[in-house]
């Protein structure tokens, strides 16, 4: 399944875009597509709220991390304010995704270099 970001109205991929892709490329009706996308993200959210990791092969891992309490400071007044401990979600991209991102970045760099050689420096 392949699509380009250029075909999107905004460069961000949204749940609505994902549902539209299921509708167009898999053949689900629009209601089923939306329900499937919503169920997918609800499942991920539920696991994270439970404090469990979410591992998506070839994409990456979502993990819950507890940040320790620490001293903070109000930037306007300089007053010391304690920051309480909290849970945060972290994402670590898989090696495969990192390689794909680096490959596309290198491809873009090579293209820019080709244009720079033909037309002078790229500014």
Swiss-Prot record:
GO terms for cellular component: cytosol. The keyword tRNA-binding does not apply. Transmembrane segments: none annotated. Pfam families: Bac_DNA_binding. CDD domains: IHF_A. Keywords: DNA recombination, DNA-binding, Transcription, Transcription regulation, Translation regulation. One of its GO terms (molecular function) is DNA binding. GO terms for biological process: DNA recombination; positive regulation of metabolic process; regulation of DNA-templated transcription; regulation of translation. This protein is one of the two subunits of integration host factor, a specific DNA-binding protein that functions in genetic recombination as well as in transcriptional and translational control. Heterodimer of an alpha and a beta chain. Belongs to the bacterial histone-like protein family. This is Integration host factor subunit alpha. It comes from Polaromonas naphthalenivorans (strain CJ2). The gene is ihfA.
